[in-house]
Amino acid sequence: MKISLFGYGKTTRAIAENLVDKFGPFDIYDDHFTETKKDTLGNLLLNPNDFDDNLSDIEIPSPGFPPKHKLIQKAKNLQSEYDFFYDIMPKSVWISGTNGKTTTTQMATHLLSHIGAVIGGNVGTPLAELDPYAKLWILETSSFTLHYTHKAKPEIYALLPISPDHLSWHGSFDNYVQDKLSVLKRMNECDVVILPKIYANTPTKAHKISYKDEKDLAVKFGIDTEKISFKSPFLLDAIMALAIEKILLDTLSYELLNSFVMEKNKLEELKDSQNRLWVNDTKATNESAVMAALNRYKDKKIHLIIGGDDKGVDLSNLFDFMKNFNIELYAIGISTEKMLDYAKKANLKAYKCEVLSKAVNEISNHLRVNEVALLSPACASLDQFNSYVERGKVFKECVNKI
């Protein structure tokens, strides 16, 4: 059986490295490969022009591999890593949505690791490296993965709210939503899906629990929010993690939940040498994440760094939302001019900075001790950085130099 891997990302590399003895050697196609060669394990590294669909039995893409790519168009036996590993997948919980996937997945694993739960998918470990004998897989599941998945399904699907994101990849918001909901049609009567009330009528055999907001979800599961130390925008993530625990174990471990430590790059606060507050929210790559960050600091004047790769999303609603705040904007990235245009139409004061270091320096000229400087860019980072993590690191380095 010949398996072709599309893209040389974390997912496909893990498959190639861990399963080469069982299924390899693999043919790995990537636009960055200009000539045919072998890696140290004997896998072939090929340019996409060399792909012959008649010589391939299975094609597995990296999750973010664009659906319009010629390899996807030619593939006859396309399947996601979820489908590929489904036959050995133990009981699983999939967590998706636009914002909060990572935090909810980490919190749920924190609550359930004592029963043998392991974390993977879009966060942590690729499926190729997960223990198939673990009691439970808790998988952060992206819309990209769901788009390519047609066989696999979880026992519990926890869907956080959906807002516009990755529209240039999916083609439209409706396509994005449909990919998020696609797994419901494969779930059965023994499965459980938790989803926003707006999608409550989506056909499925699974037991549905719909919620309007975090308060409603807490009521549905008998969760006392006063016992949770996390506040918005992380409160919903915490409630969802507890809901998953409640379904599986019929327990609510508040103390264990409250011992969870948040990861960096999400509303990560730091002070400069003048004791002024700066917030690294580099992971906020869409409008709903930025709105949540703004609401957290609504009682302060906000100096917001915004911009990057906007992924084809219309951010007009975000800028209209900003009218409710005492806010000044600092535009960066490839979308600098677009951000300035949004700001002008919304009658918001904005500075043209283009690069992150200039934005930090410009803010430093205006920022007072009782105000907040916020990197919550509403855009992806790949126009100027290798990742959102690098963007956050550079931001903190710039702040520490002040």
From Swiss-Prot:
Its BP terms in the Gene Ontology are: cell division; cell wall organization; peptidoglycan biosynthetic process; regulation of cell shape
A GO molecular function held by the record: UDP-N-acetylmuramoylalanine-D-glutamate ligase activity
* Catalytic activity, EC: 6.3.2.9
Q: What is the first-listed, main subcellular location in coarse terms?
A: cytoplasm
Gene Ontology CC entries for this record: cytoplasm
Tell me the keywords, alphabetical order: ATP-binding, Cell cycle, Cell division, Cell shape, Cell wall biogenesis/degradation, Cytoplasm, Ligase, Nucleotide-binding, Peptidoglycan synthesis
Provide the protein's localization: Cytoplasm
- Please give the superkingdom of this protein's source: Bacteria
- Stored PANTHER family: UDP-N-ACETYLMURAMOYLALANINE--D-GLUTAMATE LIGASE (PTHR43692:SF1)
Q: Which family does it belong to?
A: Belongs to the MurCDEF family.
Report the protein name in the record: UDP-N-acetylmuramoylalanine--D-glutamate ligase
